[in-house]
A protein has these predicted regions:
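Solvent-exposed segments in extracellular or luminal domains encompassing
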Residues: 26-30
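Terminal peptide-recognition signature
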Residues: 11-13, 36, 80
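Conserved PDZ fold ligand-binding element
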Residues: 1-20
Length: 217
């Protein structure tokens, strides 16, 4: 226990790599031989060498699971189920997450609209796979209209980069009658199939509508 990190300290540096969040931690601690650089409360740094089974967790616990805040959604989708929630529910149900880390770790779906170039490259470099993508349409203009985000059309190009890097993707399409069904859906299915085998699955689900839609699309 005395050799471990001090409670409340920063994440350890692993094999020369700084750890920014849980993805870095899981990726860099997978190896059986690790050199951890720990920072003491007085600011001194020391190195601890660890031997373990490949993939075995070190058992460190962090203040939050992601080691920072979950990234929130930057879209205003015309079919958003969170916007149709009844009032008076617990606060966490109204949080719209759109975080690549939660996609990989928890199976959440993301739209790719708030990923920076650096984050795209990080997903490829760390082999973060599979990820679940809310696609809805591969038509860039229509996707911008549906997600109400001017960056939404860039998502398909990002998916093609992931496909070229062999990042596995599970895709979801929320089918909205008269908007992204019919010929638009045919195009989406055709273009997603063209990214196989990286596109592992495609699910088409009907849009859900509740009575709490005042002021919505």
């Amino acid at each position: 226990p005395a050799a471990g990190p001090a409670p409340g300290g920063p994440p350890p540096e692993v094999n020369g790599h700084p750890v920014a969040d849980v993805l870095d931690y899981k990726f860099y601690t997978y190896d059986p031989k690790l050199a951890l650089v720990l920072q003491e409360p007085n600011g001194n740094r020391r190195t601890v060498r660890v031997r373990k089974e490949e993939g075995e967790d070190l058992g460190l616990e962090f203040e939050t699971y992601l080691m920072d805040r979950a990234r929130s959604c930057a879209n205003n989708c015309i079919f958003c189920f969170v916007d149709q929630m009844p009032p008076g529910m617990r606060k966490s149900l109204y949080f719209k997450d759109d975080d690549a880390r939660l996609s990989f770790l928890m199976g959440n779906y993301l739209t790719l609209t708030n990923l920076s170039q650096r984050e795209v490259e990080r997903i490829i470099a760390l082999r973060i796979s599979p990820i679940n993508v809310s696609v809805h349409t591969t038509d860039p203009e229509l996707r911008c209209e549906m997600l109400k985000n001017r960056r939404a059309g860039e998502g398909i190009a990002i998916m093609r980069r992931f496909a070229q890097a062999s990042i596995t993707m599970n895709c979801q399409i929320v089918s909205c009658p008269g908007i992204n069904d019919g010929p638009a859906l045919d195009r989406t299915l055709r273009e997603l199939a063209g990214m196989a085998p990286a596109v592992n699955s495609i699910s088409v689900v009907p849009v859900g509508v509740t009575k709490y839609r005042e002021g919505l699309y």
